[in-house]
């Protein structure tokens, strides 16, 4: 069995793939703490070798593994890859390429979207996992044999599941569709998009432009304070208090003290910083309401969006594809808005690649009035020309 990360990397090069899972702790931190990395390798005899790396107690060189993650010739197999990819990219300092996510693949193979690893194993291999250690303090040391057994079992069958799904997708002609979907993981990192954070603040639309400018400055200050102190963002300043501060724009700690939701510890430790952030926000240009995306569609669009959803769900069922893989409600809203306003097609995934082939073209014709939707005699949704 490989012992060093260099030996693990060499075996991955020889076999062309590597399975990986991580255990981490996110509670009480700004960023999750990597506690274990479990690696699965083909053993050359149809079985799997599992190696568990412990970054909290072992000194190991991640560089050889980082090279493997970045090598497009080597397939990296994960399940529900988003968090793992972001964590490995940050801690091992490497992009992650050629990802094959078994959760994504299951959606293309006729199973439900976001299928958990345990039901996926049961459905594909008839294997049942023990989950007694799934909610555990992975940062405690020493780990028990039960915890280590759970960690090993989490990747023991991963490569076999990937092979089964790839065979199914090849038979369905959808393997490249799944690989195309998995390529999106290459751009994932663990950096929070502050534009999104700002846009999702409660009651942000109720603030005046100058108040929104202060709110944006507070968002940026809060993020840096949380990152520097490795604390959850909400423990630095929760959203409701942030909005109230932006609304009142206090110029002193005494004024700040009048706002509900700020305890004495926060005022003592961060009061001056908050007031300084408010002052910087006052100097910023106002942010007009048009700069904040509405969270709800126009009421007049709701039935049209529902019509589009009906078509997408029908085509998803016919194609044995998970609906969530084809369209998101936000995509449908953007398509409906663009058709209504006579704007160019929006760049949404429903109108691109294989999705356009499955339903995107029909969706545009339906929403533009060139096609109609009805229930056929076999109780299936039919789309036909409106002429």
Segments predicted by a language model, with ranges:
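Accessory DNA-binding and partner-docking regions appended to nucleic-acid-acting proteins
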Residues: 145, 155, 161-387
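Alpha-helix N-cap/helix-start motif
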Residues: 29-30, 110-114, 267
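Gly/Thr-rich phosphate-binding beta-strand-loop-beta motif of the actin/hexokinase/Hsp70
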Residues: 15-30, 37
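Active-site-proximal helix-loop-helix substrate-binding element of RNase H-like nuclease domains
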Residues: 38-159, 166, 185-186, 298
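N-terminal accessory regions of nucleic-acid-interacting proteins
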Residues: 1-18, 22
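Helix N-cap/beta->alpha junction signal
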Residues: 1, 80-81, 238
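Short, glycine/acidic-enriched capping/hinge loops at junctions between secondary-structure elements
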Residues: 29-33, 52-54
């Amino acid at each position: 069995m490989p012992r060093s990360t260099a030996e693990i990397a060499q075996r991955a090069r020889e076999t062309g793939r590597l399975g990986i899972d991580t255990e981490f702790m996110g509670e009480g931190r700004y960023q999750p703490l990597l506690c274990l990395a479990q690696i699965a390798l083909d053993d050359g005899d149809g079985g799997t070798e599992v190696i568990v790396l412990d970054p909290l107690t072992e000194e190991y060189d991640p560089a050889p593994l980082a090279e493997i993650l970045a090598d497009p010739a080597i397939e990296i197999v994960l399940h529900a890859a988003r968090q793992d990819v972001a964590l490995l990219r940050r801690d091992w300092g490497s992009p992650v390429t050629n990802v094959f996510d078994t959760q994504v693949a299951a959606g293309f193979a006729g199973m439900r979207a976001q299928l958990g690893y345990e039901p996926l194993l049961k459905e594909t291999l008839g294997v049942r996992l023990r989950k007694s250690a799934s909610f555990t303090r992975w940062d405690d040391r020493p780990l028990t044999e039960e915890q280590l057994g759970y960690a090993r079992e989490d990747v023991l069958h991963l490569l076999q599941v990937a092979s089964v799904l790839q065979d199914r997708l090849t038979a369905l002609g959808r393997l490249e569709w799944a690989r195309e979907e998995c390529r999106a993981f290459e751009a994932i990192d663990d950096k929070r998009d502050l534009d999104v954070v700002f846009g999702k603040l409660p009651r942000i639309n109720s603030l005046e432009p100058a108040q929104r400018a202060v709110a944006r400055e507070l968002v940026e200050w809060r993020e840096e304070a949380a990152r520097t102190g490795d604390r959850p963002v909400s423990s630095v300043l929760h959203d409701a208090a942030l909005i109230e501060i932006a609304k009142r724009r206090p110029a002193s700690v005494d004024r700040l003290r009048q706002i509900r939701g700020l305890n004495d510890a926060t005022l003592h430790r961060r009061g001056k910083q908050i007031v300084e952030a408010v002052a910087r926000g006052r100097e910023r240009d106002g942010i007009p309401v048009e700069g904040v995306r509405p969270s709800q569609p126009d009421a007049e669009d709701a039935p049209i969006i529902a019509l589009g959803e009906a078509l997408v769900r029908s085509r998803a069922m016919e194609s044995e594809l998970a609906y969530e893989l084809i369209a998101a409600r936000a995509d449908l809203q953007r398509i409906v808005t663009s058709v209504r306003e006579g704007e160019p097609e929006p760049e949404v995934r429903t109108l691109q690649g294989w999705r356009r082939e499955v339903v995107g073209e029909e969706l545009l014709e339906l929403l533009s009035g060139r096609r109609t939707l009805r229930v056929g005699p076999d109780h299936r949704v039919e789309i036909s020309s409106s002429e």
